[in-house]
Amino acid sequence: MTLKKIIPNLQKTQNNNNNSISSPLLPHTVQEYFPVIIIVGMSGAGKSTALHVFEDLQLVTADGIPPSLVTSMIHTVQSSSLEHVQGLALGINQHRIHTMQELEHTFQEMRSQHIYFTLLYLEADMPTLIKRYAATRRPHPLEQYHIGLEHALEEEAKRLIPIRQTADIVLDTTTYSIHDLRRFLQKSWNPYPEKIRSIKINIISFGFKYGVPNEADLLFDLRFLPNPYFVEELRPLSGMDKKVATYVLNSASGIKFKKHLIRFLSFLLPLYDAEGRYRITIALGCTGGKHRSVAISELLLHELTKKNYTVSIEHRHMELG
């Protein structure tokens, strides 16, 4: 399910309410559809996880929003100077007595102002919701009315029936792990999948004599490459210098290694991305962390950026090497 498949259904649904849709809210940088996602549903069905995923996808997110503030918040985000905003995802405070009526009024107001929105409803079966509450040890919001958890969930489900019936998407998360839900939402709502990959890459160059980075997911030992330390004119330089980079990368082993490294990561990173991983830390080490690891890390930064990954780099021991 993708946004392009959802939009026509939204147009049909919202036009049936006697409101023609002339133009959606647009992001500041790309004149394309600007997703506004309203999240409601059963407590424990995954709303907080969904909001975290949307935040990772560069949407502005907020939880516990009263329905009366939704429209004004949409206009605030649309008119702000926030960079790289890809949309807005709002979790609604649905446990006040008059929330359902307020939500209906809010939806009518949004339609009258020609605002596209997707109403995402999350649910799960009763045993699963009870199990999740047992794991988190948090009280259900309706338990404040001196009723038990199961009764609170039943009452919540009853209150939400009108909203569920009008939802654009009803997602049953009973069999979903957190990672399953993340994968589904990333695949369905990444607005620019060919331009922005979900997974973030963190590259660290380091020196083995100072210790291996604890946060490394992938670690490469580069001490097999020719060492510029033993070349007098290169010793005071770092892998950031062109002479050192040329010495390392254009060596016989360097040429072969960089080819195999890029090919390996081109195979592996999409698999991590498809699994719903948020970040991968790649650590590349040499003896002192000044020459070889820095040169290869800078090459990797360049190559992965070309493949549209979001990449950060840290030369942890370059000044010590």
UniProtKB/Swiss-Prot annotation:
Keyword GTP-binding among record annotations: yes
Protein name, per record: Nucleotide-binding protein LI0459
Record PANTHER family: RNASE ADAPTER PROTEIN RAPZ
Family from the record: Belongs to the RapZ-like family.
Cross-referenced InterPro entries: P-loop_NTPase (IPR027417), RapZ-like (IPR005337), RapZ-like_N (IPR053930), RapZ_C (IPR053931)
Role according to the record: Displays ATPase and GTPase activities.
Binding residues annotated for ATP, in chain numbering: 41-48
Source organism of the structure: Lawsonia intracellularis (strain PHE/MN1-00)
Keyword vocabulary terms for this entry: ATP-binding, GTP-binding, Nucleotide-binding
Entry GO MF terms: ATP binding; GTP binding
Alphabetized Pfam families for the sequence: PapZ_C (PF22740), RapZ-like_N (PF03668)
